[in-house]
């Protein structure tokens, strides 16, 4: 944005408000008027080289940004709070405000202060809001994460039946999708897309049935007038936006889908004011085309973010080997929405297989891909008037890389997905690419107002203006040489002063050559006679003087015109540019997944329509990599077979028992993650994998209080379990960990027992069920499709060694006391716990509390601590005590070596 000179503020005038006896300046009157139309946004009010904020906006912004709060004038007898940010750094401040949930209205000066003065001394420079900056409508590079999409989502609803649909748009790339949903799926579908902003009709926002969903989403929800979502007017709005006479080529949309599309487009028009971001035509997603993962499962499996909200530690971070922003976003999209069509999954797997078989070629492809900038986002910035020369340069650089990739792939026998991508790359606008190469300089400025981005030789007039601007002395010297040759006057000079400007000066003795003939007089125009010299000008010199004076302005004007010409050409080729960019992202993801598979030893899964789920030597992709980084023991691979025991049968249930810290939760999660990886089209961390398509994935692993909604840990657990039991079908995969642990033992056991029976008899799905209720292992005798498996351990001298191996059978203990000891509980507490455990196991107390109290008196922990230790002869017992105190699993190699020497020394003394 160009800086403008701030106008002098006119004298105050009486405020029009009846209860406002103080006087406001015309500028402040203008501010209040504009702010009144943007009450839900912070108003960035342009004053010269700053955006100023006043009143409550200033208070909020100063706190959010950590900038000084000052004051300017008074209103209603109170000081007017004020703060400001420089225009050149506005993006940095916008980023902070958007991250904190604010929306910002950018108010610019829309006329030059000189024009305002022509209307009178008290006139205020015209200002207007040119854009509303909201979380879902960002385009600036600084405000966007290159690896994440930035979706604006709109929810549509029909009046009669209340049918729902969602439309989501990333205006930074042009992506536009729409899908129907239902009230029970609404939250899950929203969280799958993970929009930065959700726009809903104000009537729907206050709907009692939907309000809990909006409460969960929080500040990201933006209520808007219901008229924006009118499905009856949607067709006209869509036709107007896409500049088409009919929607026949768009496909068929339901009424709620039209409502959602209308709401999304209307909000973009509202926030972008006069600009129109180029969008792809809405692409419809069909129900059942992707794996349904509810929000609780998505969170517990830490697909894109960990439970604490970080990308590090997530599955996405573990598998991401992409080298472009577009590729990273496509990978994230595939991970969060795995497919359910074996045919489509196979197409993606074929691409990865081809890349693995052509590793040399793929290494060359990745080198080219590393040079691909974010073309769709550059295009979007150009289209909405926020682009710069470097955005044009990004397109040029992308075209060059695409050309290199097309050359590398020339003649290659590609699988279907990659062949289609190559075709899109080959259709990129070669003429426009060549135009950019001719027009753009090698080094490009950030801002177009700085000029210097057009290549020398592209435009002759621009070259002339630059020459005049940068080399005026040389141009004048050249013209002087021409005049000397023409007149034969060796002493002729071209000089300059502030009165005459440029002029030709000759001695009086030589002036005859310029005055003796009519032709000479018409050629050399007399300007001034001096005592010993005469001064002349020419039409040519006068024009040159004017050109020199205006050369800089003219040069910039020409460059800006060229910029607009190139921008218009880019927008005209938007579809082919986006198609080529999408194709490059496909190659990036395919090669990245091949690199991952080679690097981590992944295998190609076999995915079909069966109910099989047979994983041989499966591993947890995140934990395995973490262990490698720490140079720790290698991950222990385990099998998992939930396939039907006979043809036509239902999937199996594994009941998993074992100690805490034994690896149960890791085993459960890894199988869910393997299913997700397989269906997103990735190789998987296993020796082999045969997976019948999972249509719904449910995971209840770990829980916490939901204090904001008044839910205890147990209540959260029960709500999530209820959702699973009510929705899982035969093609579902269910992962349940320690159901019933948050309540009394018998209550928890009863609930877990009944839940397993229901999964077996009613849901009839493939399931992994981990529990510490060892009594449940008896279910294997009653339920034919249920098998007992356990995490293997070894015991040694009251300690437990976790083998992290899954084996057939059941555990009879949970080894909680040993784990407590490893966690560092005081030795007295551990010993006391061991005594209590022995009494409980020996007595089978079954609720006989009085006998238990007699056997285990209160405060016995303290009594044990306070018992005087028997006096023993150090010489006789020191070696035995030292051996007894050893905890082998807690020793480092160095400590073990030192201990051996110590024991040898003690043995010698004995």
From Swiss-Prot:
ATP binds at residues 658-665. SUPFAM superfamilies: DNA repair protein MutS, domain I, DNA repair protein MutS, domain II, DNA repair protein MutS, domain III, P-loop containing nucleoside triphosphate hydrolases. It holds the Pfam family MutS_III. Gene3D superfamilies: 1.10.1420.10, 6.10.140.430, DNA repair protein MutS, domain I, MutS, connector domain, P-loop containing nucleotide triphosphate hydrolases. Residues 1-11 have a biased composition (Basic and acidic residues). Residues 1-21 are annotated as: Disordered. One of its GO terms (biological process) is mismatch repair. Keywords: ATP-binding, DNA damage, DNA repair, DNA-binding, Nucleotide-binding. HAMAP family: MutS (MF_00096). This is DNA mismatch repair protein MutS. It comes from Brucella suis (strain ATCC 23445 / NCTC 10510). The lineage of its organism: Bacteria, Pseudomonadati, Pseudomonadota, Alphaproteobacteria, Hyphomicrobiales. The gene is mutS.
């Amino acid at each position: 944005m160009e800086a403008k000179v701030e106008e002098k503020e006119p004298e105050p005038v009486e405020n029009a408000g009846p209860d406002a006896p103080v006087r406001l300046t015309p500028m402040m009157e203008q501010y209040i008027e504009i702010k009144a139309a943007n009450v839900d946004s912070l108003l960035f009010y342009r004053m010269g080289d700053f955006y100023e904020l006043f009143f409550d906006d200033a208070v909020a912004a100063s706190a959010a940004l950590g900038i000084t709060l000052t004051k300017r004038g008074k209103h209603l007898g109170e000081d007017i709070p004020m703060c400001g940010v420089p225009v050149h750094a506005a993006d940095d401040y916008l980023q902070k405000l958007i991250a904190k949930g604010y929306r910002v209205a950018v108010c610019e000066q829309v006329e030059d202060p000189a024009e305002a003065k022509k209307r009178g001394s008290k006139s205020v420079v015209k200002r207007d809001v040119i854009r509303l900056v909201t979380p879902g409508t960002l385009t600036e590079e600084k405000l966007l994460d290159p690896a994440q999409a930035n979706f604006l989502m709109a929810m549509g609803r029909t009046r009669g039946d209340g049918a729902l649909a969602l439309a989501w748009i990333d205006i930074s790339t042009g992506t536009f999708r729409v899908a129907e949903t239902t009230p029970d799926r609404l939250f899950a579908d929203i969280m799958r897309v993970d929009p930065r902003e959700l726009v809903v009709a104000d009537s729907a926002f206050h709907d009692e049935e939907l309000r809990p969903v909006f409460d969960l989403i929080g500040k990201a929800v933006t209520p808007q007038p219901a008229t924006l979502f009118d499905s009856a007017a949607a067709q006209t709005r869509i036709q107007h936006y896409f500049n088409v006479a009919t929607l026949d080529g768009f496909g068929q949309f339901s009424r709620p889908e039209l409502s959602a599309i209308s709401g999304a487009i209307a909000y973009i028009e509202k926030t972008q004011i006069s600009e129109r971001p180029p969008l792809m035509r809405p692409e419809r997603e069909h129900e059942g085309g992707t794996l349904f993962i509810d929000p609780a499962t998505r969170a517990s499996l830490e697909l894109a973010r960990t439970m604490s909200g970080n990308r590090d530690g997530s599955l996405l971070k573990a598998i991401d080997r992409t080298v472009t922003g577009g590729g990273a976003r496509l990978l994230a999209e595939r991970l969060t929405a795995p497919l359910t069509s074996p045919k489509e999954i196979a197409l993606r797997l074929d691409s990865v297989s081809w890349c693995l078989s052509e590793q040399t070629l793929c290494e060359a492809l990745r080198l080219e891909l590393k040079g691909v900038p974010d073309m769709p986002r550059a295009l979007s910035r150009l289209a909405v008037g926020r682009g710069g020369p470097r955005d044009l340069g990004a397109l040029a650089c992308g075209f060059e890389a695409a050309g290199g990739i097309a050359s590398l792939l020339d003649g290659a026998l590609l699988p279907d997905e990659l062949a289609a991508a190559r075709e899109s790359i080959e259709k990129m606008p070669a003429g426009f690419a060549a135009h950019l190469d001719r027009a753009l300089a090698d080094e490009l400025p950030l801002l177009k107002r700085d000029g210097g981005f057009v290549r020398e030789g592209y435009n002759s007039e621009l070259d002339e203006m630059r020459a005049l601007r940068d080399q005026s002395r040389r141009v004048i010297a050249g013209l002087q040489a021409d005049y000397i040759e023409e007149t034969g006057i060796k002493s002729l000079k071209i000089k300059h002063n502030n009165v005459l400007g440029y002029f030709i000066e000759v001695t009086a003795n030589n002036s005859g050559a310029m005055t003796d003939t009519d032709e000479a007089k018409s050629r050399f125009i007399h300007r001034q006679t001096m005592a010993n010299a005469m001064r002349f000008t020419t039409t040519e010199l006068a024009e040159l003087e004017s050109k020199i004076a205006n050369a800089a302005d003219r040069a910039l004007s020409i460059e800006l015109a060229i910029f607009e010409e190139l921008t218009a050409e880019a927008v005209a080729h938007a579809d082919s540019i986006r198609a080529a960019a999408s194709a490059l992202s496909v190659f990036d993801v395919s090669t990245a997944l091949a690199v991952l598979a080679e690097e981590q030893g992944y295998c190609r899964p076999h995915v079909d329509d069966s109910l099989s789920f047979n994983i041989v030597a499966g591993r947890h992709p995140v934990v395995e990599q973490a262990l490698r980084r720490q140079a720790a023991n290698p991950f222990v691979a385990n099998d998992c077979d939930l396939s039907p025991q006979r043809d036509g049968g239902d999937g199996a249930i594994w009941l998993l028992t074992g100690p805490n810290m034994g690896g149960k939760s890791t085993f459960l999660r890894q199988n869910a993650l393997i299913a997700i990886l397989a269906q997103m089209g990735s190789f998987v961390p296993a020796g082999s994998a045969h997976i019948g398509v999972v249509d719904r994935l449910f995971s209840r692993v770990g829980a916490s209080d939901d204090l904001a909604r008044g839910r205890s840990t147990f209540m959260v657990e029960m709500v999530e379990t209820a959702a699973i039991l009510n929705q899982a079908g035969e093609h579902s995969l269910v992962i349940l960990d320690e159901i019933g642990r948050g309540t009394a033992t018998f209550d928890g056991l009863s609930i877990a027992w009944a839940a397993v029976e229901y999964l077996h008899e009613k849901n009839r799905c493939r399931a992994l069920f981990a529990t510490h209720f060892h009594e449940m292992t008896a279910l294997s005798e009653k339920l034919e499709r249920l098998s007992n498996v356990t995490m293997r351990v070894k015991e040694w001298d009251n300690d437990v060694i976790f083998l992290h191996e899954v084996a057939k059978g059941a555990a009879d203990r949970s080894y909680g006391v040993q784990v407590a000891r490893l966690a560092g509980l005081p030795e007295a507490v551990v010993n006391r716990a061991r005594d209590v455990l022995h009494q409980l196991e020996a007595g089978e107390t079954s609720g006989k509390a009085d006998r238990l109290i007699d056997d285990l008196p209160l405060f016995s922990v303290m009594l044990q601590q306070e018992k005087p230790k028997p006096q023993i002869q150090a010489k006789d017992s020191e070696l035995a005590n030292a051996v007894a105190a050893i905890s082998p699993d807690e020793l480092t190699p160095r400590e073990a070596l030192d201990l051996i020497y110590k024991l040898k020394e003690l043995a010698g003394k004995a």
